[in-house]
Amino acid sequence: MYSTSLLRWLVVALVSAVPLVTAYGFVPYPQNDAFYYPPDGWQNTERGDILKDRKIQAATLGILKWNLDAWQVLYRTSGARPNTPSYTVTTVLVPYNAKRDHVVTIASPENSNFIQCAPSYAFRHTGVLEIANFEPRWEQMLYTLFLAEGWVVNAPDHEGPESAFSAGRLGGHMMLDSMRALQKYGPLNIPDNAMHIGHGYSGGSTPTGWAASLLERYAPELNVVGWSMGGSMTDPLYTLDSLDGNPTSSLVLAGALGIVDAYRDEVGNYLHDNVLTDEGKIAEKVMRNSCVYEAVIRYFGATFQSERYMKDGRKLSSFPELTHLTDMNTMGRYPQYTPKKPFRMFHALHDEEIAWHQANKTAVEWCNNGANVNFITFSSNDLVHVTTYLWNLPYLVQYMRDRFSNKDFYGGNCQFDVEPNNPLFDTSILGERFKELLEAVLDILGKKIGPKDSIILNMIKSGKNPNKGGVWNDVLKSTTVSPGEGGNKSPESKKATKKYKSESKAEKKQPDSIPSSSSKSSSDNKSAHAKYHAHGHGHGHASSNSNNGHSHSAKESSTSKGSSRRHVARFM
C-alpha cells in the first residue's frame, strides 16, 4: 500500500528538486561551515560551555520543514579521555507547549567517518532533497513521537570532529556534555533540575551505553532518570569481526578507523601505517568521504580481514594496539563503569547485524555489578535489526513516560524478559497515525514484515547471521534476578556469571596507556587540533590540546562552577 505511493513521491520529489541546486544552492557542508569551528581560547572553557549558537529551520530529507523551534549550539566537551578537550554540535528541537524539564537526548546512528554525515547537517533545511546521508534522516522521522509528548529533543553529533564511529567513551562524554549545554543555554530555559533520558539504537547504542556508564564519574550533577538502547553494539571488536563478509561489511573498516581516530594522539595513523594494504588505503579514503549507505554499496559483502585489505590477511584481533582500544570501549568490562540509573535494553535474538549474545552478556555483567536493567529478547524469526526498533517505539515511549513519572523499575533489580511474538502496535499508546508512519518508514527502508521473513531466512541459510555460533531460544525464559545470579540460562550468561563469582570484588583497573609495543606513526601525532584538522576526513585530536584541559577529580567530574551559566560564552 505504501511502497508504490512513497516510491512515486520520492521519485517526483527528486526530479523536482534538481533545479533547486542551481536556484538556491546548498546549506554549507559542515567542513565548509564556520559554525563548526571553535573560537580561539575554546580549550580553556568548561565542559558544556556554549561556544557558538544559531537558530535553524529544521527539516527532514532537506526539504520537509518542521513546524517547531530549533537551535544548534557548538559546545565544549571531551574526547575519548576525560582530560582531552574537544567540541561538537548538538541540535535541539523544542515543540509547542514544551515541557522544558523533560529532555530526551538521542544518539542518532551516524555509522561513518565523514563529518558531512553528522546528524546536525541532516537536520538542516537545504532546499534540496537530501537522501545520501539517510542513516540519521530516517530516524529523525521518528522524533515526532517524542515531540508529540511535549518533550525537548536533544540530538548531539556524538562522533565529534573526528567522526569517530564506534568510539564509545568519546561519544559518551559528548552525550553527557550536550545535556549540560542545554541547561546552560539561556534561550531554551531548561531548568537546572531538568529530567534527562538518553536513548540510542544500533550505532547510537554505543555512545548511549557509555554515557550511562560514565555518568556518575563524569557528570554526576545531571538529573538523568533513565536510559534506553537496543540493537546494541556493546563489544566493538566482536561486532566488527562478525560483520566481515556480510552485506554491511564496510562497517568493519569504518569502525576500526573510528576507534583509532578517537585515540590518534596516542596511536597516530596506526591502521594506515601498519595494517592496511594499498587496496585497504583506497577503501579508507572511501570511508572518510562517504556516508554509510554509500560505503555499504561500494563494499557490499567485502571481506576486509583478508590479504586484499590487511597486511598478511591478519584479523583485527591480532593487533594488540587495536584490541587495547576496543577492550577499553567494551561495555561491562569494568565494574566501576556500571550504569546506576534504570536501563531498558531490547534486542532481536536473530538480529542479522549485531549479535544478540554480546549485548546480553553486557546486561548480565552490568546486573552482576548492581545495575537496574530490563533486558528484553525478541525471539520471533520475523524480527530483525530495523524492524525490532520500529515496532518497539510505542513501548519505548511508554517507558520514557514512566521514567519521567518516577515509577518503580523492578525494585532496583534486573528483569530479563523473552518475548516470542512480534510486538503488537498498541494504538492506545501513540495512536493510529503513528502506526501508519512506522509502516511507511519500513516500506522506505525496504524491510519486509511477516511470517517467514525472507531477509532473516536468507541470512540464516547463507550462514552469515552473526548469531550462528549460538541461538538459545529453547532455554530462554523470563526471570527476575539480583546481582550475582546471572541473567538467563544461555551459555554466555552462565559464562559471565561464573566469571563474576570467581573474581575478587576488587575493581578491574582501566588501562590508561597504550601498550609499549605501540608505534606512533609520525610527528604529526602531536600537531595542533586546528579547525577540524582536515575537517571531515577522520583526523582527530592532538595531544597539544590536552595540556589546556582542567584538572579533574578522581570521579572525572566537572560541574562548571567557574563558568557563567545560561548564556553564550563569546571568545571572538
Swiss-Prot record:
Q: Name one GO cellular component term.
A: extracellular region
Q: Which residues are glycosylated?
A: 360, 525
SUPFAM superfamilies in the cross-refs: alpha/beta-Hydrolases
Q: Where is this region: Disordered?
A: 468-572
Q: Single GO molecular-function term?
A: triacylglycerol lipase activity
Disulfide bridge positions per record: 117-291
Q: Which UniProt keywords apply?
A: Cell wall, Disulfide bond, Glycoprotein, Hydrolase, Lipid degradation, Lipid metabolism, Secreted, Signal, Virulence
Annotated EC? 3.1.1.-, 3.1.1.3
Does the record's keyword annotation contain Disulfide bond?
yes
Comp. bias (Basic and acidic residues): 491-511
Q: Name one GO biological process term.
A: lipid catabolic process
- Active-site residues, as the UniProt record annotates them: 202 (nucleophile), 351, 385
Keyword Ribonucleoprotein assigned: no
Q: Which reaction does it catalyse?
A: a triacylglycerol + H2O = a diacylglycerol + a fatty acid + H(+); a monoacylglycerol + H2O = glycerol + a fatty acid + H(+); a diacylglycerol + H2O = a monoacylglycerol + a fatty acid + H(+)
What is the top-level taxon of the source organism? Eukaryota
Low complexity bias locations: 512-525, 541-562
Bias kind Basic residues: ranges: 528-540, 563-572
Subcellular location, record wording = Secreted; Secreted, Cell wall
| Signal peptide (UniProt feature, chain positions) | 1-23
The record's principal subcellular location, in a coarse class, is secreted
Q: Which Pfam families match?
A: LIP (PF03583)
* Annotated InterPro entries: AB_hydrolase_fold, Lipase_secreted
Function field: Secreted lipase involved in Dandruff and seborrheic dermatitis (D/SD) probably via lipase-mediated breakdown of sebaceous lipids and release of irritating free fatty acids. Shows only minimal activity against triolein. Mostly converts monoolein to di- and triolein, while free fatty acids are only produced in low amounts.
The entry's family comment says: Belongs to the AB hydrolase superfamily. Lipase family. Class Lip subfamily.
Annotated protein name in UniProt: Secreted triacylglycerol lipase LIP6
Which species does this protein come from? Malassezia globosa (strain ATCC MYA-4612 / CBS 7966)
- Cite the source lineage: Eukaryota, Fungi, Dikarya, Basidiomycota, Ustilaginomycotina
